Design a protein with these regions (language model features):
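Structural signal for interior beta-strand "rungs" in well-ordered beta-sheet cores
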Residues: 1-136
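Terminal amphipathic alpha-helical/low-complexity segments used for targeting or macromolecular assembly
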Residues: 1, 124-125, 130-175
Length: 175
């Protein structure tokens, strides 16, 4: 009740929609949960068995024709109030901690090495959280957003909710 899927969107069998919104051209895979107040933008591609937690914003694209949509791969969990926008991608089985912002220009950094893994792409089976890193400009030092991969998981580990909660809590991330 209270959910809207616009004409021209596609919801696979078994999709669960709480009061939420799926826009035209979006594709939502089987067994996916679109939780309360989550929004799936135009042409976004959401895989199978994904959980979009409360208030998640998945960006959309309608134009230009060569714009890159958001892709959330199978089995991912997108935490409450995350924003994933045009051209960003979340890999299979990955977890974004609550409030994470991901776009194509935001660096994704490995917490163990400090190395930049990619921009706008969280690899498969990673636990990632929003963070910031110091940058120097003529006007001073400022902290710019980044996404920090705090753990890489095996495929089976992703579905152990107790282990996942412990990983997040060990790093001070709300679950």
């Amino acid at each position: 009740p209270g959910a809207t899927a616009r004409y021209g969107s596609y919801l696979s069998p078994g999709v669960i929609m709480m009061p939420s919104y799926v826009n035209i051209g979006a594709w939502v895979g089987p067994g996916t949960m679109v939780d309360t107040w989550a929004t799936v933008g135009s042409c976004a591609q959401i895989g199978a068995n994904v959980h979009l937690a409360g208030g998640v914003g998945i960006g959309g694209v309608l134009e230009p024709a060569n714009a890159v949509p958001v892709v959330i791969e199978d089995g991912a969990f997108i935490g409450s109030r995350c924003m994933v926008v045009e051209g960003a991608r979340v890999g299979k089985g990955s977890v974004l901690g609550a409030g994470t912002i991901l776009n194509p220009s935001i660096p994704v950094i490995d917490a163990e090495t400090g190395e930049e893994i990619s921009r706008g792409y969280v690899p498969d089976y990673c636990v990632a959280v929003g963070a910031s890193r110091k940058r120097e400009f003529n006007g001073g030092e400022f902290y710019l957003p980044c996404v920090l991969v705090i753990r890489r998981m095996s495929e089976g580990e992703r579905h152990d909710k107790v282990a996942l909660n412990n990983i997040l809590r060990d790093h001070g991330v709300a679950t």
